[in-house]
Amino acid sequence: MLSCDICGETVTSEPDRKAHLIVHMENEIICPFCKLSGINYNEMCFHIETAHFEQTTPEKSFETLAAVQYENSDLGNTKLHSTVEVTSGIHSACASNFPKESSESLSKDRTLKQEAFYTESVAESRKYQKSREKQSGLSEAQGSIYETTYSPPECPFCGRIERYSQDMEIHVKTKHASLLESPLEDCHQPLYDCPMCGLVCTNYHILQEHVDLHLEESSFQQGMDRVQCSSDRELAHQLQQEEERKRKSEESRQEREEFQKLQRQYGLDNSGGYKQQQLRHMELEVTRGRMHPSEFHSRKADMLESIAVGIDDGKTKTSGIIEALHRYYQNIATDVRCVWLSTVVDHFHSSFGDKGWGCGYRNFQMLLSSLLQNEVYSDCLKGMSVPCIPKIQSMIEDAWNEGFDPQGASQLNNKLQGTKAWIGACEIYTLLTSLKVKCRIIDFHKSTGPSGTHPRLFEWILNYYSSETEGAPKVVCTSKPPVYLQHQGHSRTVVGIEERKNRTLCLLIFDPGCPSREMQKLLKQDMEAGSLRQLRKCVGNLKHKQYQIVAVEGILSPEERAARKQASQVFTAEKIP
C-alpha cells in the first residue's frame, strides 16, 4: 500500500498515487484560518506563522502542525490535510520580530532577514523529511512532479554551509543564539542602540561588531571619496591644460594675423613695390575699358625709363603754388595780419604705383625740390634731380649700408627696393644727413594744449620762419626750406604759416594725398579764399597724439657728417615739451 505525502491518504498502486498527487496540484491552497488563497505553499506557511501567530504558537521542535486546506472547484468541499514540521527555534527567531508578542522590535533589515531564514528553514525541513522517506523506501518515483534538486543550507548570519538542515539548526542555535533571542515584556534585559542607525541590540559584542561594520563602510566611502577627489583634480588639471593650450594657440594665431596685417600695412608682405603696383593698376584699367592698350604700353615704357634713370617723370608734380600764394596774400587776403612762406617748392601727389604707402617719399620729393632751387644747397646736391620712388629707396639703402641708423635698417630688414615699406622722419633725416644736409628732428610727443592740441608745434614753426625778420611786411618769402611733418599713419609738408588779425595761427600744408587737379586751382589769377581751405590747418585741426618734424638748417661739414653718423647708432630726437 502507498500513502500520499501531502494528506496521508492510502492508495493501492503507484499510478493511483500519481493521479492523486495531480489532484493536489490542481487544487487551490486556502488558509485554514482566514480562507486566504491565490499564493504558493511557502507563502501560505509564512502567512499562517505571521498572521495567525497566536493560533500556531510552537510548543517544541518538529511538533508544530500547520493544517493547510486545499479546495477544488470540481470536487466540491473535499478537504485534505497535510502536516508540516517547523523548527520551533527558528519559528521563535522569526516571531520575535513582531511587536504583538514583544515590547521591543528589531530593525526592519534584521526582521526581513529572519523571515527569509524562517521560510528557507521550512522548505529545508520538508526536504529533510522527504530525504528520510526516500531512504526508507517511501520516496516518490522518478519523474514525480515534486522532485527537486537538493542544495546544502547556508547560514544567513555567517554564510556557513551544512549538509543537512538539522546540522544547520544546531549551528544557528549554538553559534548565533543571541541573534535568535528577542527582548520580552517585563524583562529587564539590557538594550543597546546603534549610534549610527538606531538598531537595537541585546548584546554588547554584537553591537560592537555592528558598529565596526559601519566604520568599515564609512572608511571605504571616504576612500572612494578620496579617489573621486583625486580623479576630479586630475580632470580639472587636464581641463586647465587644455584651456591653456587653446589660449596659447589663439594668442599665437592672433599674433600671426596682427603681424601679417602690419606687414601689409607697412608694405613688407612681399607683394611687390612701386613697379608691380603700377603695372597691376594699369592692367586693371585696361580690363575695365578705361585705358586703351596702346596707352598702357606707352605709360609702361615711360615708367620703366623713369625707373632706369632714377628720375621722377614729373606726372604728379604741380609747380608755381608758392608764387600764387604770395600774390593772393599780397592782394586779396584781408583777414591775415602776416604770412611767412618757405622757398619755392613743387607739390608731388601719390600715383597709382605708390597709393596708400608713398606719402613719405612724396614729401621728400617736395623737400628736395625746394633744396634744389636754393643756391645754399647747390654744392652738396650738385647734379641731382628729383628722384623717383625706387631711386629714393635705393638711396636710403645706401645710407644704411654706410652705417647710418642701423636700428631703423634692422626694423625694415635692410631692404626697401621692391617693397611698399613706409618711411618716416628717421629715414628722411638719415637720407638728408647722408647728402650732407644739416637737419634736426623735433618730437612733439604729447599735446600741449586743450583737447589734445599742439600749440607749441605752431609756435616752433612760427619761430622757424620768422627768425630772420623783424618788423616784416604782410607777406614774407623766407629763405627757409619747407618742414617735413610726420604723424601716425601719414606725413605732409609745411610750406608756411599765417598769423591772422585775431592772433591765431594757421599752418600752410602740402598734402601728397591731394591730387594735381585740386592743387592747380590755386594757380588761378582770381583764386578765392575757399581754395585755401585744403592748405590751411589751424590749431584745432592737428589733434594727433604725437607729431615729429624734420627741419633743414644748412650744410654739414665732413666732420659733422661723420659725427652725426656715429650719433645715429642710437637714434634720439629732441623732445618738446
Swiss-Prot record:
<dbReference type="GO" id="GO:0008270">
    <property type="term" value="F:zinc ion binding"/>
</dbReference>
<comment type="similarity">
    <text>Belongs to the peptidase C78 family. ZUFSP subfamily.</text>
</comment>
<keyword id="KW-0677">Repeat</keyword>
<keyword id="KW-0862">Zinc</keyword>
<comment type="function">
    <text>Deubiquitinase with endodeubiquitinase activity that specifically interacts with and cleaves 'Lys-63'-linked long polyubiquitin chains. Shows only weak activity against 'Lys-11' and 'Lys-48'-linked chains. Plays an important role in genome stability pathways, functioning to prevent spontaneous DNA damage and also promote cellular survival in response to exogenous DNA damage. Modulates the ubiquitination status of replication protein A (RPA) complex proteins in response to replication stress.</text>
</comment>
<comment type="subunit">
    <text>Interacts with RPA1 and RPA2.</text>
</comment>
<feature type="active site" description="Proton acceptor">
    <location>
        <position position="490"/>
    </location>
</feature>
<protein>
    <recommendedName>
        <fullName>Zinc finger-containing ubiquitin peptidase 1</fullName>
        <ecNumber>3.4.19.12</ecNumber>
    </recommendedName>
</protein>
<feature type="active site" description="Nucleophile">
    <location>
        <position position="359"/>
    </location>
</feature>
<keyword id="KW-0007">Acetylation</keyword>
<dbReference type="InterPro" id="IPR038765">
    <property type="entry name" value="Papain-like_cys_pep_sf"/>
</dbReference>
<feature type="region of interest" description="zUBD/ZHA">
    <location>
        <begin position="248"/>
        <end position="273"/>
    </location>
</feature>
<feature type="zinc finger region" description="C2H2-type 1">
    <location>
        <begin position="2"/>
        <end position="24"/>
    </location>
</feature>
<feature type="zinc finger region" description="C2H2-type 2; atypical">
    <location>
        <begin position="29"/>
        <end position="52"/>
    </location>
</feature>
<feature type="zinc finger region" description="C2H2-type 4">
    <location>
        <begin position="192"/>
        <end position="214"/>
    </location>
</feature>
<feature type="region of interest" description="MIU">
    <location>
        <begin position="225"/>
        <end position="247"/>
    </location>
</feature>
<keyword id="KW-0378">Hydrolase</keyword>
<keyword id="KW-0863">Zinc-finger</keyword>
<feature type="region of interest" description="Disordered">
    <location>
        <begin position="231"/>
        <end position="262"/>
    </location>
</feature>
<feature type="zinc finger region" description="C2H2-type 3">
    <location>
        <begin position="153"/>
        <end position="176"/>
    </location>
</feature>
<dbReference type="InterPro" id="IPR012462">
    <property type="entry name" value="UfSP1/2_DUB_cat"/>
</dbReference>
<dbReference type="GO" id="GO:0005737">
    <property type="term" value="C:cytoplasm"/>
</dbReference>
<keyword id="KW-0963">Cytoplasm</keyword>
<keyword id="KW-0479">Metal-binding</keyword>
<dbReference type="InterPro" id="IPR013087">
    <property type="entry name" value="Znf_C2H2_type"/>
</dbReference>
<dbReference type="GO" id="GO:0004843">
    <property type="term" value="F:cysteine-type deubiquitinase activity"/>
</dbReference>
<feature type="modified residue" description="N6-acetyllysine">
    <location>
        <position position="261"/>
    </location>
</feature>
<feature type="site" description="Involved in the stabilization of negative charge on the oxyanion by the formation of the oxyanion hole">
    <location>
        <position position="486"/>
    </location>
</feature>
<dbReference type="GO" id="GO:0005634">
    <property type="term" value="C:nucleus"/>
</dbReference>
<dbReference type="Pfam" id="PF07910">
    <property type="entry name" value="Peptidase_C78"/>
</dbReference>
<keyword id="KW-0539">Nucleus</keyword>
<feature type="active site">
    <location>
        <position position="511"/>
    </location>
</feature>
<dbReference type="InterPro" id="IPR050688">
    <property type="entry name" value="Zinc_finger/UBP_domain"/>
</dbReference>
<feature type="compositionally biased region" description="Basic and acidic residues">
    <location>
        <begin position="231"/>
        <end position="261"/>
    </location>
</feature>
